[in-house]
Regions:
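Central cavity-lining transmembrane alpha-helices of secondary-active solute carriers
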Residues: 35-62, 82, 342-348
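Residue-level recognition of pore/gate-forming positions within transmembrane alpha-helices
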Residues: 43, 79-83, 181-185, 255-259, ...
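C-terminal ends and interior cores of transmembrane alpha-helices
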Residues: 61-62, 73-96
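Intracellular loop-helix junctions on the cytosolic face of multi-pass helical membrane proteins
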Residues: 90-102, 114, 126-310, 333
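Substrate-agnostic recognition of the 12-TM MFS/MFS-like secondary transporter fold
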Residues: 7-8, 15, 42, 46-49, ...
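Hydrophobic/aromatic positions within or immediately flanking transmembrane alpha-helices
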Residues: 37, 75-76, 102, 174-178, ...
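Interfacial helix-cap and linker-helix signal at transmembrane-aqueous boundaries
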Residues: 26-27, 56, 60, 156-165, ...
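Helix-loop boundary and gating motifs at the non-cytosolic
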Residues: 1-46, 107, 232-236, 300-325, ...
Length: 348
């Protein structure tokens, strides 16, 4: 159960960075509530990490996969990316590099959402088949671990920032991020002691990928990407948010690539290297989307995605803006650390 607790901590700790630290950092640098609120959109990636879960199941990292296992290698890679992001944050000023800081925050969110895919699977593997009765206890321990990583990690983060500020350190948030890197390193040391089973599972997945590509599913996926991209583009234009507009254009380009792929297959057939490459992309991207909408229907599928997205966005904004509210009515970072984080961890 301690291994499951550690996995929960690893999963929850990145939220300290993009939910607590980033919000207060931007607030104390004098940025507006609307800017901080818009930055909360990076949490939307957690609602859609299932879209790239099939890709994660099929990726082999050179050396690492064979050395420590497939799932642990993915977690270690994502943790390394988060460390690099913290290094970048530690040398930036929000008033001068706002877009870059939010972009780095998005990279942390994507890395966190990606590692959650493998953390959940690795957590389940820690409970043996003959211990299936312990599954509920394992799920509870995972929740405890997540809240420990988020709340207790948030307490440590805010206390460090408060003490550095009181000591006269100018860029105390940037120095705080350096300290937080140490916590991530310690978590990865603990990760090395967690065993991983089912290493033959990777080859079994590849063996089932062979030739189940449906051209119509590729066309449907292209339409979906283009529709999402067009919606994001219009939202970005309406609110004058260039990074949202660029994200929409990226989705449109991805959709166009899939549509060109479907045309290529119809025109030249499937027995060539280019088609085989697109077949792989289809199996890990288009097929899961197509299966989701085929099982639920287009209307129900869109409704489910919209519900999850709106739920996560509401949760993200509430958490972020509550810290801004506490700061505006006079609470210090130390107060927030004690009453919101430490006591919140105990009660949760």
């Amino acid at each position: 159960m301690l291994r499951i607790l550690l996995l929960g901590i690893i999963s929850g700790f990145p939220w300290v960075l993009i939910a607590s630290a980033l919000s207060l950092w931007l607030k104390e640098e004098g940025l507006s509530r609307s800017t901080i609120g818009w930055a909360g959109l990076i949490f939307g990636v957690y609602a859609f990490n299932f879209l790239w879960a099939p890709i994660i199941d099929r990726i082999r990292l050179p050396f690492l996969t064979n050395k420590i296992g497939h799932r642990k290698s993915i977690i270690l890679l994502m943790q390394t990316i988060i460390l690099i992001c913290l290094i970048i944050w530690s040398v930036l000023e929000p008033t001068q590099n706002l877009a870059l800081i939010i972009g780095v925050g998005l990279a942390i969110a994507i890395s966190s959402a990606t590692q959650d895919i493998t953390i959940d699977a690795l957590r389940i593997e820690q409970i043996k088949k003959e211990e299936s009765a312990s599954m509920a206890a394992g799920a509870a321990m995972a929740v405890v671990g997540w809240w420990t990583g988020f709340k207790l990690g948030g307490y440590v983060c805010l206390e460090i920032a408060e003490k550095l500020e009181n000591s006269g350190v100018d860029q105390y948030w940037q120095v705080t991020f350096i300290f937080l890197m140490g916590i991530i390193v310690l978590c990865n040391v603990g990760l090395s002691f967690i065993p991983e089973s089912n290493k033959e599972r990777f080859q079994n997945i590849l063996n089932t990928d062979a030739s189940n590509t449906n051209v119509e599913s590729v066309v449907k996926a292209s339409y979906l990407f283009i529709a999402i991209g067009a919606l994001c583009f219009l939202i970005g234009q309406f609110f004058e948010k260039i990074w949202f507009t660029n994200g929409g254009l990226t989705f449109v380009v991805i959709g166009a690539v899939f549509y060109i792929f479907s045309f290529f297959i119809k025109k030249f057939g499937a027995e060539n290297p280019i088609s085989q490459t697109f077949y792989y992309l289809n199996n890990v991207v288009a097929n899961p989307l197509s299966s989701f909408f085929n099982n639920n229907g287009v209307r129900i599928g869109i409704a489910i995605l919209a519900f999850v997205f709106l739920f996560k966005i509401g949760e993200a904004f509430l958490g972020r803006m509550s810290l801004v509210f506490y700061k505006e009515i006079g609470f210090s970072k130390g107060d927030i650390a004690i009453y919101s984080k430490a006591l919140g961890w105990i009660t949760t």
